[in-house]
Amino acid sequence: VRDAYIAQNYNCVYDCARDAYCNDLCTKNGAKSGYCEWFGPHGDACWCIDLPNNVPIKVEGKCHRK
């Protein structure tokens, strides 16, 4: 497990405005909890605590949305 920005397809973070949205998203993916980190290095994005290793996370590089 690790603490990290949970990622969508193409290395994109989940944008957020509310902690509750991120907490729900993170816990549904097996994390202990989550919150919305405002003004972080990837903008306003969901950060998960104790996220399982099989769940994608944001890695170095750009978001490659099609």
From Swiss-Prot:
Disulfide bonds: C12-C63, C16-C36, C22-C46, C26-C48
Predominant subcellular localization, coarse grouping: secreted
One cellular-component annotation, GO: extracellular region
Expression tissues: Expressed by the venom gland.
SUPFAM superfamilies: Scorpion toxin-like
A biological process term (GO) from this entry: defense response
Key words, A-Z: Disulfide bond, Ion channel impairing toxin, Neurotoxin, Secreted, Toxin, Voltage-gated sodium channel impairing toxin
GO molecular function: sodium channel inhibitor activity; toxin activity
Source superkingdom: Eukaryota
Domain spans labelled LCN-type CS-alpha/beta: 2-64
Compartments where found: Secreted
Pfam families: Toxin_3 (PF00537)
Family membership noted in the UniProt record: Belongs to the long (4 C-C) scorpion toxin superfamily. Sodium channel inhibitor family. Alpha subfamily.
Functional note: Alpha toxins bind voltage-independently at site-3 of sodium channels (Nav) and inhibit the inactivation of the activated channels, thereby blocking neuronal transmission.
Domain comment as written in the entry: Has the structural arrangement of an alpha-helix connected to antiparallel beta-sheets by disulfide bonds (CS-alpha/beta).
Protein name: Toxin Boma6a
